[in-house]
Amino acid sequence: MYAIIESGGKQYKVAEGSVIKVEKLDVAAGEKLTLDQVLFFNDGNGNVKIGNPLVAGVRVIAEVMEQGKHKKITVFKYKRRKNYRKKQGHRQPYTKIKVEKIEA
């Protein structure tokens, strides 16, 4: 059984027990979370539900494991011959969640 959900403008394939990192959500660690933006659902027995754009009656229950930041990336802007250099760093925040069950 798996589902494809949308969170933070991105799509994720999730199954029961899977751990994923999504864009930062305003939820504390340890709290339960209901994701009802389900785009696709497959129960494993050949029954498939495709949303238009969302599947009605299907939701994903997850627990927030932690809030964190990804590794730092360097953003470097440069203009030749003009002595213009700009160096910045960026760490994108994320929320790590564990899918507990998919309710259909």
Swiss-Prot record:
- Biological process terms in GO annotation: translation
Q: Which GO terms describe its cellular component?
A: cytoplasm; ribonucleoprotein complex; ribosome
Q: Relate the assembly described in the record.
A: Part of the 50S ribosomal subunit. Contacts protein L20.
Q: What is this protein called?
A: Large ribosomal subunit protein bL21
Q: Which UniProt keywords apply?
A: Ribonucleoprotein, Ribosomal protein, RNA-binding, rRNA-binding
User: Which PROSITE patterns does this UniProt record tie to the protein?
Assistant: RIBOSOMAL_L21
Signal peptide range equals none
Q: Which gene encodes it?
A: rplU
Q: Which family does it belong to?
A: Belongs to the bacterial ribosomal protein bL21 family.
Tell me the InterPro entries matching this sequence: bL21-like, bL21-like_sf, Ribosomal_bL21, Ribosomal_bL21_CS
Function, please?
This protein binds to 23S rRNA in the presence of protein L20.
Gene Ontology MF, one: rRNA binding
